[in-house]
Amino acid sequence: MNNNKERFFGVGEPLIQRENDQGIRAEKYLDLVKGLGCNAYRSWMHLTEILKDPVTPDEKALEQHTRLLTRARELDIEVTGMSHEWFLPEGCKQKMGHAMPERDLTPGSLYMKALEMLEQSWCTMAGLFPQVAIWEIGNEWNLNAFLHPDGFLESDMSKPFTPDEKYDIAVDMMYFAAKGVRRGNPNAKVASFSPALSTEGLGGGLPYFFPVMYGVAWALDQIYSRIKSGKFWSTDTDDYFDLVAWHPYVFTTRDVSDRDLFMDVEEPDTLWRDFNDAAYRVMRRYGDGGKQVLLTETGFTDCGNPEWEERYAGYNKKILNYAMNMPYVRTLHNFRLLNENAMLQRAGIEDNQIGGLTEVYFGLFTDPEEGCRPRKRAYAIAEMTGSEADLQKIGRELTGR
């Protein structure tokens, strides 16, 4: 394997959330990550959960994440830290969330105060956790669920940001977030926000006649064209990010609702590769062909269907093989380590929330309440990495079940 694939196999999971919800210490789950043969891990590190305000850490959260990161270093697992929540200034309807006030670059505006708080928050975070090699400074900002107007979720949700408004705001946020990270830890690398699919209902602005996953390339073109326009903070993409991230999920090409795009998907083929190559073509067009790419989320949900579980294990191996032969890809983070049964109590993506049946069954292992038993995709990934670890045993030792 060539040098840029040394950290190719990755996996993501909000392990501190799992510790808080289910009592098993977060760092113990890293034995599952290592058992899979993965040496990269994407950690949910929300600014608003680790910090009380942009300069003050929550001591409990600081201790938890430090434990997790210390264990990752012991196991030689590289960590990408990701946050998709931030603080908002007094005068906004919300104190925090995925929201921003109306874009207003006037000094002292609520919008500028929010950007300044974002910069300071990232400075604090990067300084607190020098163990984190890469900071992914946003998540799916091309979608309404992850970037919307202040107070949106408490409204009838009929007036999201337009795609142009979202991309303008995303460029601003990346610039200020990157400044903060580099102030806090000049040695850390900054990954762009990670765009995902685009549909008319979910947001993103992709013309309706394209397959939804070309929303990634579309979003990147919108971002790059703004940076290079001379109308934003800098025309140098390095001032916004060092690496580029995106989410190349496999979706059905059938005409279905947004909620069902994950369901009963077809076998990934060269079209899946081209979704990714199209995004990279955008990078090259704007002079960024030398930057590495993190595929920070991709995976499959079988919704508890045994036939889908078996089929998707094969699909997972196929996309790993494709990605291994994409020279620009540094790491592929499989989503996600664990099933989460609690997702059944949450609303789904069509309500701009993350929950429902499809969100339960992305896991490589069962929910801890079911013993963290390896599922078919876990064995498929272990086969790809060459791991001979006893995944059943690791799960039993972890949960005592």
Per-region residue spans from a language model:
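Aromatic-rich peripheral "rim/lid" segments of glycoside hydrolase catalytic domains that contact
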Residues: 146, 152-161, 311, 326-401
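A structural motif corresponding to the C-terminal end of an alpha-helix
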Residues: 36, 68-78, 124-132, 173-188, ...
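Boundary/entry segment of secreted carbohydrate-active catalytic domains
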Residues: 1-44
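Noncatalytic carbohydrate-binding groove/subsite architecture in carbohydrate-active enzymes
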Residues: 164-309
